[in-house]
Amino acid sequence: EERRNYKMYVELKNINKTYGDYKASSDVNFGIEKGKLIGLLGPSGSGKTTILRMIAGLENPDSGEIIIDGEVVNNIPASKRGIGFVFQNYALFRYMTVFDNIAFGLKIQKKSKKYIKERVKELIKLIGLEGLDNRYPSQLSGGQRQRVAFARALAPNPHLLLLDEPFAAIDAKVRQELRSWLKEMIQKLGVT
């Protein structure tokens, strides 16, 4: 009885997406409880990235509903969904320092310089990269770049964090360390 009344934080209902003749997703249905960490499993080309991009608002489904915190978000732009997204290739700006990469979303949101400085310093400490604020991505290891990508996604305080194979380009030892670190951060911050 209690489970039936439980409201999912994220729900996908009958999501369909095609690219020409290719069906990237077909009647996808699932829900995610608030504060939970889940993974989408499937072979290459099965539509996992497409689903994440639709939840984020970077692509629109052909049909179906995406519901976040009780609201249908199909027509809400990505910038208004309150979602952090970490891409497989990090997507860091190579000509921006660690500080500026992390601050990017906050500047877009037009936060005050004081707030940006405090928030970025807090995140740099959280990811364990104190003293590296002025380095560029090319001066960092793969694991450090990935932590900067996580910090950038977390900077605007998203309620939902989407990760698209964030550990694929990292060696096995660092991958395991980052997985443990990320799980701990997500629990600490209460992000879904």
Where are each of the predicted segments found?
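The feature captures the beta-strand-to-loop junction immediately N-terminal to the Walker
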Residues: 41-43
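ABC ATPase nucleotide-binding domain helices that frame the ATP-binding cleft
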Residues: 49-52, 148
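ABC ATPase nucleotide-binding domains
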Residues: 81-82, 92-192
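Helix-to-loop junction immediately C-terminal to a conserved catalytic motif
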Residues: 56
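Conserved ABC transporter NBD signature motif
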Residues: 64-72
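Conserved coupling/switch loops of ABC nucleotide-binding domains, chiefly the family-specific signature
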Residues: 62-65, 115
